[in-house]
C-alpha cells in the first residue's frame, strides 16, 4: 500500500511540474501545407533562421483548417500562409485564440488560370468553350480556400463545369501535360507560385470579383505567442518578401531535392535582408 501511495505521489508531482513549467520555449511548432509552394518555401526559410538562433523547429504538416484549429488550441505555434481577406477569411474568423503577427507578402492573387495559347480572356467566355475545356476546372485540395471560391465562381457565372478536386501536385501535373499537348485547360491557380515562371500562363478576368482582388499573405500565431515569445513575435512581424525576393525563393525551391539545404543557401545569399528581419 505504501508503495502504491508513493507511486501516486510521484505521478502527482510530475503532473504538477508539467503544469507549472508549461511548454518548452525553445521548441517551436510551425504548421505547413505540403504542396503549397509559397508556404513551404517561407516555412523552410524561417526554420533555418530560427535554428541558427538556437530553437528546435518542428514542422507540422496538415491542412489549413487543421493547422488553424491546432493553433487555436495552443498545440501549433505558427502558420505562415494565411491568405486574407478572401481565401482564409471565413476560416480565421472561426478561431478566437489566434493572432496576426505580420504580413509576409502583399501581391498575392487567386484566379482561374489558362495557358497563354488559350484564346479567351475572361471567365464568362468559358460558357462558349465547354467542349475545348471538357467542361472541367482542375482544382486542388477540397479543404483549400480557393476551392470554395472556385465553387462559387461556377455558381456566379452559371458554368456547366465540373470542379475536379485532387491535389496541388496533381493539378500542376495535369497542367504540364496539357501544355505539352497544346490542349486547352483551366485550373485553379494563384500567385506567388513557381508555375508562372516555368510556364506561360494567364489569369482569366473575373468581372464579378468572385475570386476577389489582391490578397495579402499573413503570418498567424497562437493567441499567447506574442506574450510568451516576444523576440520571435518581433522577428515574424518583420518577415516580408517583395515580388523579386519571393520569385527568387520559389525558383530556387522548385525541384529542389533538399529544401532545407536550399533554404540555407537562400538565407546566406540574402543575408542583409535576413539581418533586417532580426533587428
For each predicted feature, which ranges?
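Ligand-binding cleft/hinge of the Venus flytrap
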Residues: 45-53, 128-164, 268-269
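An extracytoplasmic/periplasmic, membrane-proximal ligand-sensing/linker region
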Residues: 28, 38-41, 149-161, 165-182, ...
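Short helix-initiation/N-cap motifs at beta->coil->alpha
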Residues: 34-37, 58-72, 163-174
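C-terminal motif of bacterial Sec signal peptides marking the signal peptidase cleavage site
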Residues: 15-18
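A bilobed periplasmic-binding-protein/Venus flytrap-type ligand-binding module shared by bacterial periplasmic
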Residues: 109-119, 215-229
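A conserved helix-loop-strand patch within extracytoplasmic ligand-binding domains
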Residues: 97-146
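Short, well-ordered beta-strand elements
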Residues: 24-38, 55-60, 134-138, 236
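A ligand-binding cleft/hinge motif common to bilobed small-molecule-binding domains
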Residues: 80-94, 177-202
Amino acid at each position: 500500500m505504501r508503495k502504491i501511495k508513493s507511486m501516486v505521489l510521484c505521478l502527482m508531482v510530475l503532473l504538477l511540474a508539467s503544469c507549472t513549467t508549461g511548454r518548452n520555449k525553445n521548441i517551436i511548432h510551425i504548421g505547413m501545407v505540403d504542396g503549397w509552394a509559397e508556404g513551404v518555401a517561407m516555412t523552410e526559410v524561417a526554420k533555418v533562421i530560427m535554428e541558427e538562433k538556437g530553437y528546435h523547429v518542428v514542422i507540422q504538416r496538415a491542412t489549413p483548417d487543421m493547422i488553424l484549429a491546432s493553433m487555436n488550441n495552443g498545440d501549433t505555434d505558427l502558420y505562415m500562409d494565411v491568405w486574407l481577406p478572401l481565401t482564409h477569411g471565413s476560416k480565421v474568423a472561426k478561431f478566437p485564440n489566434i493572432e496576426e503577427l505580420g504580413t509576409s507578402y502583399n501581391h498575392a492573387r487567386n484566379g482561374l488560370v489558362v495557358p497563354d495559347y488559350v484564346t479567351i480572356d475572361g471567365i464568362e467566355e468559358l460558357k462558349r468553350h465547354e467542349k475545348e475545356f471538357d467542361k472541367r476546372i482542375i482544382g486542388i485540395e477540397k479543404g483549400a480556400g480557393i476551392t470554395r471560391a472556385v465553387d462559387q465562381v461556377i455558381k456566379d457565372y452559371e458554368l456547366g463545369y465540373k470542379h475536379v478536386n485532387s491535389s496541388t501536385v496533381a493539378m500542376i501535373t495535369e497542367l504540364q501535360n496539357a501544355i505539352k499537348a497544346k490542349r486547352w485547360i483551366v485550373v485553379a491557380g494563384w500567385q506567388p507560385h513557381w508555375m508562372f515562371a516555368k510556364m506561360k500562363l494567364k489569369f482569366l478576368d473575373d468581372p464579378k470579383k468572385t475570386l476577389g482582388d489582391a490578397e495579402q499573405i499573413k503570418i498567424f500565431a497562437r493567441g499567447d505567442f506574442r506574450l510568451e515569445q516576444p523576440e520571435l513575435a518581433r522577428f515574424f512581424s518583420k518577415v516580408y518578401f517583395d515580388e523579386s525576393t519571393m520569385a527568387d525563393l520559389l525558383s530556387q525551391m522548385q525541384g529542389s531535392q533538399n529544401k532545407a539545404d536550399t533554404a540555407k543557401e537562400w538565407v546566406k545569399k540574402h543575408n542583409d535582408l535576413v539581418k533586417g528581419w532580426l533587428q
